[in-house]
A protein has these predicted regions:
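Phosphopantetheine-dependent thiolation modules in NRPS/PKS and related acyl-activating systems
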Residues: 2-37, 46, 51-79
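Two-component histidine kinase catalytic core, primarily the HATPase_c
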Residues: 41
Length: 79
């Protein structure tokens, strides 16, 4: 799977789960701000992404990650 496809799937899943139109989300957007979520909701999103991609993302790999592109890169590295 390409990084572009991984990024697209991350954006689509976030869009569906948080009921934000997909066209309002971009790879470089801060997901906390763009989705209007808190850290617990972000953790829920990460859990859903792990299930969707059948991976496990260690906490240390996610520290400081707040944009969709970097999140997709971390996921891609585990595929």
């Amino acid at each position: 799977m390409s990084l572009q496809r991984t990024t697209d799937e991350v954006l689509q899943l976030a869009s569906n789960y948080f009921k934000v139109p997909r066209e309002q989300l971009g790879p470089d957007d801060d997901f906390f701000k763009k989705l209007g979520i808190n850290s617990l909701q972000a953790l829920d999103l990460l859990t859903r992404l792990e299930q969707h991609f059948h991976i496990e993302l260690p906490d240390y790999e996610l520290q400081g990650v707040s944009d969709f592109r970097t999140l997709a890169e971390r996921i891609q590295s585990r595929l």
